[in-house]
């Protein structure tokens, strides 16, 4: 579990389970965050294998209930047993951090649940690749999920559950669209097939904070092509 400290630092967290992503994805995410945070922060990894070869400053937290499958492990992000104090920025492992992340912590209230609009259709749903929350205010998400697990497990995944619970919640704030964008679908609401898109030149959106690589391709694959050549300068 997380260590208690005398004041609330900013926190960044990711989730790593199974073999879908090598451990280097965790370490690269930490490295990108380190370059793009001017404020002190803790970096946590919620994982089924806390003894993995994580970078020195990565603080592993064992997933409390390892019987969860796949993306349902992400519901543990809201589990008060993590004992993380202060605001928490969650990012999927397949993102590329482009610019400073401080505003996730400085521009909103602690009680605000911050999320981004989805990239495909409809854009009115929540994309769970990037979220900011606080266990003091949002651990009810985990409690509600556990109390209605059979109902929620019938949904497609955690993203649908978060949309159902939080889209109309009074403290939910949708982050500015220009903070995040999709590598595959750079304009929200205009999805393309990646195999048609990948060979094209893909200009970097230099004012964005995070580029999301949902589905295929991942950053390490995309940067082999002209359309993702810029990724080499950031995903490291």
Give residue ranges: language-model regions.
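A generic structural signal for well-ordered coil/turn residues at beta-strand boundaries
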Residues: 126-127, 207
